[in-house]
Regions:
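Interhelical loop/hinge segments that connect adjacent transmembrane helices in multipass membrane
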Residues: 1-5, 9, 149, 153, ...
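Transmembrane helical elements of multi-pass membrane transporters/channels
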Residues: 12-27, 158, 178-194, 207-276, ...
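Helix-loop junctions and terminal segments of transmembrane helices
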Residues: 60-77, 257-295, 345-350
Length: 478
């Protein structure tokens, strides 16, 4: 079979695709069902709770998983790799418990927070803070070792548990707190399974080693927190400036942008842990070509997600959620630029210039939030437009400085053609919403981007099997 002849990298990406769709796509899978039981206001509160959890998890986690990509990834000896990641895992658990305890005390002492969330909500949130960093390192280690099949099994088990529990909650007591609790329990289940699967040993590498790791990851954590202002904080602004119902509609649109990001993750999960190793041992040409393939993949997904999402909302959700269609194009553009920022940010991280990354994120985030305040009088589109502009600026600035530090041989003419075509298709999809037009726009956009990639030989890096030769052999054999 042709699939058996695919490179192992592509096989792993396909396996990761299924795994990530199961783990992170569950919210989208369950959306039609949840929309029948929950109002936009309830979905808005659930989104607010999830957003706060993500922010605090970033704070408490100290970006310790980034050390795996940077330091473990450069080691050749497998024993050294395992010893290093065991030290990293131990550090992550201890730091999460220490910092998480402090954050927990602060949260329970904040009266404004208690007016929005219940005490049980806060307790569940604090539970997540204690294990999220260790969970991230455990999952990253499986990807680093290319144990895609183990990753898939864990994903299936956790998804079955989560879906079953959510359905029970929806039919018995459709309360936001209980739905959130299911997610927390699922995370704990994953951590237990992963701890046994990876077999990490408790290993303390000393304060000097910890200081070295934190010097690298702490600026990244700050940078990520600042960047959160463009990838999550807008939900706080929407909930405060407009209404919790409006936030619920925005959350529905954002779930489809998340779906696009989920479909990008198989490539990211395969490539991100290996990019520095590839740059070091396989060269700039290989690194640039793989990155360009990722760009094409992201662009095609953006066009497809914008069209499919419009059809899904109008066909599968109650009429109360139809206004979310008008927000789809904006949130897809935001997600597009955010993913491109992560994809092209190679040189800055490779040269360990995390302070520079922090400065860039601070400038772009402050500019974006300033625009949000200035343009909020134009409604929710003023906020979406501000975030999209800030994300696009951030992507361009990161690419510029990354190239100055490590100049990769990107084919910028081809990349610009693909970007212009992608943004044009997204604009057309916003104007022409009839299903036939959406399908035609999607097909044209995908074919054009693939044609450019073929013309500039982006895909040659993967050594794909020659399907035409397979077809000829099949015909001769018959």
């Amino acid at each position: 079979m042709i699939i058996d002849r695919l490179p192992s990298s592509l096989k792993n990406m396909l396996t990761y695709a299924v795994s990530i769709f199961l783990v992170k796509g569950i919210s989208l899978i369950m959306l039609p069902i949840m929309a029948q039981f929950l109002s936009p206001a309830q979905l808005g509160k659930l989104e607010l709770l999830a957003t706060t959890t993500v922010f605090l998890s970033l704070l408490v986690g100290l970006a310790m998983h980034e050390n795996l990509y940077r330091f473990v990834g450069e080691l050749k000896c497998k024993v050294e790799q395992f010893n290093k990641v065991s030290e990293l895992y131990t550090y992550a658990v201890m730091l999460s418990l220490m910092v998480g305890s402090i954050v927990t005390i602060v949260l329970f002492l904040l009266p404004p927070l208690q007016s929005v969330f219940t005490a049980l909500d806060i307790a569940l949130l604090c539970t997540v803070l204690g294990f999220e960093s260790a969970l991230g390192i455990s999952m990253a280690w499986l990807r680093f070792k290319d144990r895609a099949s183990s990753f898939l099994v864990i994903s299936v088990v956790s998804t079955v548990f989560q879906v079953s529990a959510i359905l029970i909650v929806l039919y018995i007591a459709p309360v936001v707190t209980y739905i959130y609790a299911v997610g927390v329990l699922t995370g704990l289940l994953q951590l237990v399974i992963l701890h046994k699967t990876n077999g990490f040993t408790w290993s303390w590498g000393g304060m000097r080693n910890l200081k070295k790791l934190l010097m690298y990851s702490f600026p990244l954590m700050l940078s990520t927190l600042v960047a959160f202002g463009l990838t999550g904080a807008e939900k706080w602004i929407i909930g405060y400036s407009f209404s919790i119902e409006t936030l619920g509609l925005y959350a529905v649109a954002a779930k489809f942008a998340l779906a696009m990001c989920i479909l990008i993750q198989p490539f990211s999960m395969w490539w991100m842990p290996k990019r520095f190793n590839a740059l070091l041992y396989q060269g700039k040409e290989y690194t640039a070509r793989v990155t360009q393939c990722g760009f094409v993949y992201i662009a095609i997904l953006a066009i497809s997600a914008a069209s499919v999402s419009q059809l899904f909302i109008t066909w599968a959700l109650p009429s109360d959620y139809f206004p979310a269609v008008e927000l789809l194009t904006g949130v897809i553009v935001v997600a597009l630029f955010k993913e491109l920022s992560d994809l092209f940010n190679i040189g800055i991280l490779q040269q360990k210039k995390t302070q520079l990354l922090l400065v860039i994120n601070v400038v772009c985030t402050l500019g974006g939030l300033g625009l949000c305040l200035t343009l909020s009088s134009y409604g929710i589109w003023g906020i979406i437009g501000s975030i999209a502009f800030a994300q696009g600026s951030r992507a361009a600035i990161l690419l510029y400085f990354s190239q100055r530090l490590v100049k990769l041989p990107f084919q910028f003419t081809a990349l610009l053609l693909i970007l212009v075509n992608t943004l044009g298709c997204l604009a057309l999809g916003f104007i022409y919403t009839h299903p036939v037009w959406l399908i035609l726009i999607t097909l044209f956009g995908a074919i054009f981007n693939l044609a450019i990639a073929y013309r500039y030989e982006f895909l040659s890096v993967f050594n794909l099997p020659r399907f035409s030769s397979d077809l000829q052999r099949t015909v001769r054999g018959s």
